[in-house]
Amino acid sequence: MAEGIKDKVAIIGMGCSKFGERWDARPEDLITEAFEEALNDAKIEKESIDAAWFGVFYDEQNVGKSAYPLSQYLRLPNIPVTRVENLCATGTEALRGAVYAVAAGACDIALAVGCEKLKDTGFAGLPERTKGTFEDLYQPGFTPPGAFAQLGAAYAHK
């Protein structure tokens, strides 16, 4: 039977960039702002970080398809960095990867970072239904936020 991880992992710090229309800030500025706050909150040096997970969904509007920008922006060389995406749950997916790595004993301190910056890129929202969206994979009218809302409601009902 699976064993829980609640006694194996602790979140020791967190940071968040200032919310709002940040026209002057690039994605790497937002990432760095949140990272520095997290380091201060955790009272650790960045050299203590053993691995990182980087959540970004709309890569073309943000930082590209690779996880490399995270280690470049934060000056975190020589640690593994994994890029993840999972629609609206991408940030949670990054956190999940970091938590599982610590719980498994693969590292002592892991970093989870999520970043999206869409409004100043010309991005208008989910793609039109005629441009190869989820319509053929799921029921008509499916959108990721709607599906997550239904899953949340079903979970709360149980």
Stretches with model-predicted labels:
Residues 1-81, 103-104, 114-158:
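Conserved "HGTGT" condensation-loop signature of ketosynthase/thiolase-family condensing enzymes
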Residues 80-88:
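A short, structured active-site edge motif that brings together acidic residues
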Residues 106-110:
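Short, high-confidence coil segments that cap the C-terminus of an alpha-helix
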